[in-house]
Amino acid sequence: MSHLPILLLLLLVSPGLQAAPTQTTSLKATQVNCSNLREEIVTLLNQPPLPSSNFNNLNREDQRILMKPNLRRPNLEAFQKAVKSLQNATAIESSLKDLPLCLPMATNASMQHPIRIKDGDWNDFRMKLKFYLKTLEIKQPQ
């Protein structure tokens, strides 16, 4: 028997284990467990059919764009737009709608373009979204 459901339940009900709100996160973000949301999206991305999700296949320019703090929201908007062109992606689309609550408010508008995702290409979408989520995990305190 797996203890994962019990652990997840404890994380949801125990206030000491939840992240404290910071100045960079909205109050609504306290209602959304950002770490769990990222993990949920990654779990959905890992469902078959699985592409090779080797981040080394992601070119340096795409990595740079996905790592830029001032492009977090524009990149998320690009993923939200791209998910609409994918089949069987309703669950991911729903989770992406909650993700803006986990991002800091934009400080200044960027003149750079957000990430480009090939229309209808699951492999491209998965690889880039996984990398993007990983950068959020590293950059954002939880």
From Swiss-Prot:
Alphabetically ordered keywords of this record: Cytokine, Disulfide bond, Glycoprotein, Growth factor, Secreted, Signal
Tissue spec: Activated T-cells, mast cells, natural killer cells.
Source taxon at top rank: Eukaryota
BP term (GO), one: immune response
Protein name: Interleukin-3
Chief subcellular location: secreted
Cellular component aspect of the GO annotation: extracellular space
Subunit-level organization: Monomer.
Signal peptide feature range: 1-18
One term of GO molecular function: interleukin-3 receptor binding
Function noted in UniProt: Granulocyte/macrophage colony-stimulating factors are cytokines that act in hematopoiesis by controlling the production, differentiation, and function of 2 related white cell populations of the blood, the granulocytes and the monocytes-macrophages.
Disulfide bonds: 34-102
Organism name: Saguinus oedipus (Cotton-top tamarin)
Localization: Secreted
Family: Belongs to the IL-3 family.
Positions annotated with a glycan in the UniProt record: 33, 88, 108
